[in-house]
Amino acid sequence: MFFIGAMSPYSWLAAERISQLLPHAIWQGVFAGAIFKANGRSSWGLDEQQRDARMADCEARAAARGLGPLRWPQPWPTNDVAVARAMLFAERRGALEPFALAAMRMAFCEGTDLGELSAVLEAGRRVGIDVDELRRALADQELKDALRAATAEALAAGVFGVPSVIVEGQLFWGDDRLEEAAAATRRGATST
């Protein structure tokens, strides 16, 4: 399982390469803000001691991987609840991966604020999701409850940040751990 938050630049960096390393990974969008809150912390983007260094790290990783210059949305971080709900909506239509990539590319390649409903709807439009249907669903209590449940499941599985990958019960947290997760998958495949 590959857990992502759309406003996490490290989730974006991992999402851009996970299909090469873990082609059968099942994507799961979560509400990162709720995961931070459950663990008694907030986004590193709000921590002055970490912010500049981590932003520079993300920019360097993006450049090294040929993803172009990272363009930070303003403001960042922003409220990601609507885009997290939209990821769940997209998942139900078999479009989570393209939607999540479109949304994260809008955020980190174009500098688009995904805290704006219009941006979330545009990400849906780009991947062929009916925008009117998406708009209605984002306000629906059932989708709100489903996001809470998906996030609670991630927390119960041990997820404390995004991106995270779980392979055979082992948690790999961070963009820089994808290779280890892929190696664990290969080891599991050869031991069965």
Predicted regions and their residues:
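C-terminal cap of thioredoxin/glutaredoxin-like
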Residues: I4-H24, R105-T192
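Structural alpha/beta surface segment adjacent to cysteine/selenocysteine redox centers
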Residues: A6, Y10-E110
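Beta1/beta-strand and adjacent pyrophosphate-binding region of the FAD-binding site
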Residues: M1
